[in-house]
Amino acid sequence: MRAGPIGSMGSLGTRGTLLGLLTATALLYLWDLGASGYADPLYSAAVQAGSESWPAFFFGSLDAGNAVTIGNAPVAVWIMAFSARIFGLSPWSMLVPQALMGVAAVGVLYATVRRVLDRGGRDRGRAHWAALGGAAVFAVTPVSVGAFRWNGPEALLVLLLAGYCTVRAVELGSRQWLVGTGVLIGFGFLTGLLPALTVLPAVIVAYVVGAPVGWRRALRDLLAAGAAVLISAGWYVAVVELVPARWRPFVGGSPDGSLLGLIGSPRATGGVVEGAAESWSGALVAWLLPAAVILTIFALGWTRSAIQRAGLVLFGGWLLVAGVAGQPAVLPPAIGGAVGLGVAILWSARGSLPARIGLSAAVGATAVWAVVLSSRTAGAYPVLGWVAGILGGLAALTLLVGDRLAKVSAVAVLVGAVLAGLAGPAAYSLVTAAIPRAGGGAVAGAVIGGNELDLALLDGASRYDWVAATVGARSAARLQLGAGYPVLAAGGLDGSDPTPTLAEFEEMVRQGRIHYFVTGSGDQVPDASGPALEIQTWVSANFPAQTIGGNTVHDLADAGQ
């Protein structure tokens, strides 16, 4: 095959194909979005609280009574709660901003990859198609679809970490753009805590190897960017820490009620993946992971362009650190970026045997991996995997010996490679979008007062700071979403947080601030420990139990206490 551009078209065609990708992405992320109801009840309750109380909004509290936070940084909740303030609380007002952030993130990744190739010299002819392909890989990775159709922090976090500012900083040797990168990472920290920092090592190395500045200037620029990270993340941490504990909610998931305590806890590393990626299942994220690694290695060995090298280091390093840290939710942009850059760089050099080996190995590994992943599931997936595997195998063989097969169409080879790489994740993504999912028994829809317990909680609700209390944040969130009034989560996130203490709870009851205590609701109330167990024991010993809608309920306003 003759080495040359993948294809070319005018600016109208370029804009049209990009618009087509973004439109298809929007349809994938928005289609029947309300079917999952309130999705994760924990974040939905925080959105509800933030739409009713500005202090709850600022702290990311679970309830408008401002008793306990959701155990994560609040910026993602701010966006959804602000939408709920404008349009009213509903699944659509909460989830549409998430989906739109996903579309924006796909567009930003396209711009990032295209800029690297446009500024990298001889690969300009294929920059659009490579960037489009990388963005498509990102868009149809199942974990991306799950994240952008969900109400967790993943959507905003991924948008903030898309890497465009880093590429501009490398291209221009610009401290301003690098500081902008730091600001985005800092706000990423305020979105998902430590997972936001997985991109930081890659940013540092990319700037050092690619920016047209000396090492002293690079060091000063990186220090300025580090200061930007600290300031953009630290201001909020400082405010929370400086506000006396009695004037703010207990920070859920922390051992001592402080945000610093949460940052130092195991939850700070794992909370992000809770909604969109429950596990490291390969079907969620890993379809093109082997290809991304292979293409990055071979492309780094071939390219002589500083900005291309920096782009590969950025996405490859991001991939490495996020993979080692076990953060699948932030991997798709890195996979898409690495695939887009690697294919463009090696395709331009496919007249060379090493470049053909790299392309062939990437396509072949993807084909084999598609068979392996699809064989783990039932239905038509194994058949689809074998079809993708066969097409990918043929494409890999053709790429390897392509210089001897002059009559073989480059377009046919690319089609086979694309089908091998995208058939599996696209199929999984369509299923992800088509099947409604709700986390932890979330309320499906904006139904207030929809069952017997909800109606009981509504009785005189306006007279109480909390219409009920129960053990654990998720059980409290479900009750709160059903009743439409604040519910106190005893024991914080999982029933083990030391809040409130028994003495504090007794005082709340004496002051008439809590109406009911729910001690049983099937398997939806977690086991209590610490102060929550003491509270539950005290309530059971002092207040008669009654059954309402299958739930064990104690009336704390009962005069017989």
Q: Where in the sequence are the language-model features?
A:
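Membrane-integral, polyisoprenol-dependent glycosyltransferases
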Residues: 1-261, 265-358, 365-369, 431, ...
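Residues at alpha-helix caps and immediate loop-helix transition turns in enzyme cores, especially N-
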Residues: 39, 200-201, 501, 528-531, ...
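Intrinsically disordered, low-complexity coil segments
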Residues: 117-130, 183, 402-409, 419, ...
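A general structural signal for short secondary-structure junctions and capping/turn motifs
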Residues: 228-229, 251-255, 419-420, 459-460, ...
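Transmembrane helical bundles and short interhelical boundary loops of multi-pass, membrane-embedded
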Residues: 350-448
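Short periplasmic/luminal acceptor-recognition loop of GT-C membrane glycosyltransferases, typified by
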Residues: 423-495, 510-538, 543-557
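Structural motif corresponding to alpha-helix initiation and N-cap regions
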Residues: 450-451, 499-503
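Short, charged/polar, Gly/Pro-enriched secondary-structure boundary elements
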Residues: 559-561
